[in-house]
């Protein structure tokens, strides 16, 4: 049997150990002012980490001055830890098996979630989702 998500969990753990034990700072990638929304939409629609580890891993974009791709983090860590204003995007599954995207918005230390509607074809990059992601990003810019 396949072990789905193992490689993503190993990558997250290795990065966390490098930060805590070796003092190696996380590589983050700056995003242009207009890149954050399309980047998050693409991640919701296609990121294998999010699809293999639904509601466990999230793509994080922070907004401490300028938008930065902070990479993949465990969702629980994003929700529980302090940090700069940011948006964490993940894909979740309800009890009936319906898949839907969720944005967790951290602003001034408080977290709230924006649950987006499901799409039967998982087209989370479509215009309706763009408006939702834009609204979340505006909260933290």
Which residues make up each language-model segment?
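Glycine-rich phosphate/pyrophosphate-binding loop and the adjoining helix
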Residues: 13
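Rossmann-like nucleotide/phosphate-binding core characteristic of flavoprotein oxidoreductases
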Residues: 4, 8, 16-141
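Short FAD-binding loop at a beta-strand-to-alpha-helix junction that anchors the flavin cofactor
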Residues: 1
């Amino acid at each position: 049997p396949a072990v789905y998500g193992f490689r993503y969990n190993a990558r997250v753990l290795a990065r966390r150990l490098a930060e805590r034990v070796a003092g190696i700072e996380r590589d983050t990638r700056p995003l242009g002012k207009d890149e954050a929304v399309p980047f998050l939409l693409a991640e919701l629609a296609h990121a294998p980490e999010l699809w293999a580890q639904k509601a466990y891993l999230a793509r994080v974009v922070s907004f401490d001055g300028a938008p930065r791709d902070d990479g993949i983090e465990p969702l629980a860590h994003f929700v529980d830890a302090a940090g700069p204003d940011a948006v964490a995007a993940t894909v979740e599954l309800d009890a009936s098996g319906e898949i839907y995207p969720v944005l967790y918005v951290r602003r001034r230390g408080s977290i709230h979630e924006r649950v987006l509607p499901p799409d039967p074809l998982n087209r989370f990059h479509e215009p309706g989702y763009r408006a939702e992601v834009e609204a979340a990003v505006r909260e933290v810019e």
